[in-house]
UniProtKB/Swiss-Prot annotation:
A GO molecular function held by the record: AMPylase activity
Function: Nucleotidyltransferase involved in the post-translational modification of proteins. It can catalyze the addition of adenosine monophosphate (AMP) or uridine monophosphate (UMP) to a protein, resulting in modifications known as AMPylation and UMPylation.
Binding annotation for ATP: G81, G83, R84, K103, D115, G116, R166, R173, D254
NCBIfam families assigned to the protein according to its UniProt record, in alphabetical order: PRK00029.1
Catalytic activity, reaction form: L-seryl-[protein] + ATP = 3-O-(5'-adenylyl)-L-seryl-[protein] + diphosphate; L-threonyl-[protein] + ATP = 3-O-(5'-adenylyl)-L-threonyl-[protein] + diphosphate; L-tyrosyl-[protein] + ATP = O-(5'-adenylyl)-L-tyrosyl-[protein] + diphosphate; L-histidyl-[protein] + UTP = N(tele)-(5'-uridylyl)-L-histidyl-[protein] + diphosphate
Cofactors required: Mg(2+); Mn(2+)
ATP-binding is among the record's keywords: yes
Name of the protein described by the UniProt record: Protein nucleotidyltransferase YdiU
Length: 484
């Protein structure tokens, strides 16, 4: 790997230098060829294994943990930081630079009495979801590899330590700006320094002045809205939408007790530590705005409040428009280039009626959408009909849907288009759990199989049909722990 060290050299007060502590008996558990290409790597080697496991130095790496704060479940925590993630620097690739981080690399000054380690199950889950979201077309950080060990660590019980090698376009979070506004008061110069760095690195078309700052914040608002629209359309629940888990670039970031929906449930909670459902699936759009408001508060020393509010007021429109675009494609509806607010509302109601029907009939979210690939939209009798209990209610919806759809001349092409946007394969929690259990037993084949299938989520892959089925009773709607 070839590195540059812009964050390390230009922002010395934004991190602590810390070196990883190696893990015993490191071995590859998973490797992403797709992610490796981003930083010009070929095959996993023993030398690379030793370097990324913390047992040997990586040439050109600087090793540091970033400091930030954040709002966690609504309350402000003044000092967080990378408690178990150590960044090596920005690795150069054919299409730009990517931060390389060792998640589980050992304790840092921000570990808050933790051991700085990640357990194998959480490392595998982060690897799988990073790559799954990418291949579904959702903005996300990436995962290069998972490195296992025989090092014992204690959570609820004894587990083994592992390292996820994460790639990110940037590790700058909403919480970075909050730290230098709230926790380090009177340091507007640091806010400006961080803001200028962010613009130069990731928004080179914007000037480092008030006009550029205003344009940048509006872009952050729009990117965040688009990200959450993706989550709602694909049926993804993040689980821990704290402001320190929000990427300034609008990428899915810092995965913990996430879940893809099995049965559609608007108020689905995937996080065992969130009994009141602050971060439930249906709450994500509102939390996205709330988090942006916290970021806006942190930026008031450098951007006037009126300008911040004006940008925040664009959030709902950006969210709805992107969500409509994604859902219209899923349904096969033509995009209305010059749609009116009334027409948009009609489409939202049509979509909403269908998801309500899904919830009332306890239908599988992804599999129901996939059924549109076998639908003859010109037929008065829908092949979806047998899935519903209240046939009158479905028939009324289907008639409204056909009226909005209009005439379809090439049914086969229409069906293929639906299959290209409605995935057959998603990372169901029970599939991840089965792969993790197999790894614990020394069998990597289920993990490798699942990873390869998730690389082509829209393909039929008939030999892997079992991975597309609804989960068994024990695996339906699994709620995960935050411990990792």
């Amino acid at each position: 790997m070839k590195f540059k060290q812009d964050f390390f050299t230009q922002l010395p007060e934004f991190y602590s230098q810390v070196y990883p502590q190696g893990i015993s008996n490191p071995h590859w558990l998973a490797w992403s060829e797709d992610a490796a290409k981003l930083i010009d790597l070929q095959q996993p080697t023993d030398a690379l294994l030793q370097g990324l496991s913390g047992n040997a130095a990586v040439e050109g790496a600087s090793y540091y943990a970033q400091v930030y704060s954040g709002h966690q479940f609504g309350g402000y925590t003044p000092r967080l930081g990378d408690g178990r993630s150590i960044i090596l620097g920005e690795a150069l690739g054919p299409q730009g630079a990517w931060d390389v981080a060792l998640k589980g690399g050992g304790p840092t000054p921000y570990s808050r009495h933790g051991d700085g380690r990640a357990v194998m199950r959480s490392a595998v889950r982060e690897f799988l979801v990073s790559e799954a979201l990418h291949h579904l077309g959702v903005p996300t950080t990436r995962a290069l590899a998972v490195i296992g060990s025989d090092m014992p660590v204690w959570r609820e019980s004894q587990e083994t330590a592992a390292i996820t090698v994460r790639l990110a376009r940037s590790h700058i979070r909403f919480g970075h700006f909050e730290f230098f506004c709230h926790s380090e008061r009177g340091q507007a110069d640091k806010l400006t320094q961080l803001l200028n760095f962010t613009l130069k690195q990731h928004y080179p078309n914007l000037s480092c002045d008030l006009a550029g700052y205003k344009a940048w914040f509006l872009q952050v608002v729009q990117d965040t809205a688009k990200l959450i629209a993706h989550w709602q359309a694909i049926g993804f629940a993040h689980g821990v939408m704290n402001t320190d888990n929000m990427s300034i670039l609008g990428d899915s970031f810092d995965f913990g007790p996430f879940a893809f929906l099995d049965t559609f449930q608007e108020d689905f909670i995937c996080n065992h530590s969130d009994p009141e459902g602050r971060y439930a699936f249906g709450q994500q759009p509102g939390i996205g705005l709330w988090n942006l408001q916290r970021l806006a508060q942190a930026l008031t020393p450098v951007i006037p409040s009126d300008d911040l509010i004006a940008a925040l007021n664009q959030y709902q429109h950006a969210l709805v428009q992107h969500y409509l675009m994604l859902m219209r494609v899923k349904l096969g509806l033509t995009e209305r280039a010059d749609s009116t607010a009334e027409q948009d509302q009609q489409d939202l109601e049509l979509i909403g009626r269908f998801t309500v029907l899904m919830e009332k009939n306890q239908l599988d979210y992804s599999n129901t959408w996939r059924r549109f690939g076998q639908l003859d939209p010109s037929s008065a009798h829908s092949s979806l009909r047998d899935d519903f209990i209240d046939l009158n209610e479905f028939d009324a919806w289907y008639q409204a849907y056909q009226a909005r759809l209009g005439k379809v001349t090439d049914i086969e092409a229409w069906q293929q288009a639906r299959n290209s946007v409605n995935p057959k394969y998603i990372l169901r929690n029970y599939l991840a759990q089965e792969a993790i259990i197999a790894v614990e037993e020394g069998n990597l084949a289920p993990l490798e199989r699942l990873h390869q299938v998730l690389r082509q989520p829209f393909a039929e892959q008939v030999e892997h049909e079992d991975l597309a089925k609804r989960p068994p009773d024990w695996g339906q709607g699994l709620i995960m722990s935050c411990s990792s």
